[in-house]
Amino acid sequence: MRKIGAFLLLLFVIFSCGKSGNNDKTNKEKGTATKNEQDVMNEIEKKKEEVEKYNRYVEVYNNLGNMDGRIIRYFEEAGNEEKVRKVKGSFPVMHVNQSTIDNVKQNLSSKVKMDELDKAAKDMLPYIEEVKTLAEAMESYYEGKDFVSDNYAKAQEMHTKFLAAVKKYSETTSAFKKAMEKQDKENKVQAIEEFKKNGEMVRYNLALQMKLNEDFLAEIDNQKLDISNFTNGNVEKFKELRDKISKQYEETEKILANGEELKKEGYTNSVAIASFKRKMTEFKGSTASLINRMETKKKGESGEISNSFYAEVSEGTPENVYRVFNEVVREYNNLNR
């Protein structure tokens, strides 16, 4: 599952509103703000609250991806059938981040309304909490090796409850993810247009690069490809998208080497810039590796297919493209802090 860039909308709103609000803010601080100026400041504050709430939902979305991965690894060990399979190796870490629950609760109590996202978040909250409770109980059970004394009796009981909870969790989080992805797509299109119009060429090129990267992942989704079937996909579609990524990559590299423009837009963290460039290059390479494996029909090996970790770290798999992209998102967010 891909991640959404948390800081894109935040930068867009504050910068675009701030242009008209800087003088008004000065007047307000002097105690001389007119009614119109006060209205502008109130609008900026309202937009800021909206962005903060949206970014909390982005964090929730990203954390759901981590939860999904842990659930998959549990089922790889214990099975997803009614009868639990005895876990022979170390039990997979099942920790569910408390901040996910806290962010949902904070957003649901917010005065800012986002009807579609709020409804989906409210529906999924009890199942996230249930999965968290069960995951912690199972982790404690396996770490304490209680299965030695009860011959997996408690393991079976928790596994049965976990299967039911995950079913509801998957149904409700799916609705939330779809709502987030729809909103994120709209936000990115709007932001790219505004960045270009305002002459913010660093932000424009970064946002466009991220959009093209996401288009590549969207095609993986559209073709329903994973480690088990990706060599059967339409490779020509990916070549077209790879060419667009490569062309924009050259423009992004140029703008990130433009010290004057970087300084003008507030990009002064050279370490963050270098880290983003490295991950951006790695992502471009991961798309090339996927295309190469598709063209040479190098199918997924049994170890890659049976274990999600190996699928993610093996070059040229859809799962690897996703993993590297998620790391690009992390560096993109760090760059825009």
What is the predicted role of each segment?
Residues 2-8:
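Sec-dependent signal peptide recognition
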Residues 13-16:
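C-terminal motif of bacterial Sec signal peptides marking the signal peptidase cleavage site
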Residues 18-20:
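Bacterial signal peptide processing site
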Residues 25-87, 156, 160, 167, ...:
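Immediate post-signal-peptide N-terminus of mature secreted/exported proteins
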Residues 69-150:
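Post-signal peptide N-terminal segment of secreted/secretory-pathway proteins
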Residues 117, 122-195:
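Acidic/His-rich structured neighborhood in mature extracellular/periplasmic domains
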Residues 159-280:
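Extended amphipathic alpha-helical interaction segments
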Residues 239-337:
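A cross-kingdom marker for long, charged
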